[in-house]
Amino acid sequence: MTCDPSTPTIREATQQDAAAIARLAEDAGMGTLTPRGTSYVALSEGRIVGFIRIVKAEGDRYVSPIVVDPQARRLGVGRALMQDARARYGALLFVARGPAVPFYTALGCEQVERERISPDLGEDCDTCPDFAACRHVPMIYR
């Protein structure tokens, strides 16, 4: 697959994108996502190669989740999705899985206290079967 990281097309997701988003989430081990928030998709050569969902809780905007197709990783898709969401909404809060923390740190995200994360979003971590192994880190992208 060819993916030009300098030109991923990002747009708001439509109902027609639901199956591709569900497949990416399932492949990432996230199971079935609950319908909430607003999702945006990244396209390369007309194919969805990633998505980000933004959820509003307690006046803040949260990334919940961001997923990039494994074949499109390290090509700028995740960076483009995060930058686009920040441009649309301002500061973004989220809980990073441990292995993804270096990506977020390189993007300029900072660690925050767990209490900064809305309980509505934090419960996703509390009920996750991978919670103990995940080494989750609450973060903000300003």
Describe every region a protein language model picked out:
Residues G98-C125:
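Conserved active-site alpha-helix within GNAT-family acetyltransferase domains
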Residues V41, R47-V55, D60-V67:
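Conserved beta-strand in the GNAT
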Residues T38, G59, P99-A100:
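A generic "binding-loop/recognition-motif" signal
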Residues M1-G31, S39, L43, E115, ...:
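Short amphipathic alpha-helix that is part of the acyltransferase structural core
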Residues D120-H136:
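Cysteine-cluster motifs in flexible loop/terminal segments that predominantly coordinate metals
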Residues M82, A87-P99:
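Conserved GNAT acetyl-CoA-binding A-motif
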Residues V68, R74-A87:
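Conserved acetyl-CoA-binding loop-helix of GNAT-fold acetyltransferases
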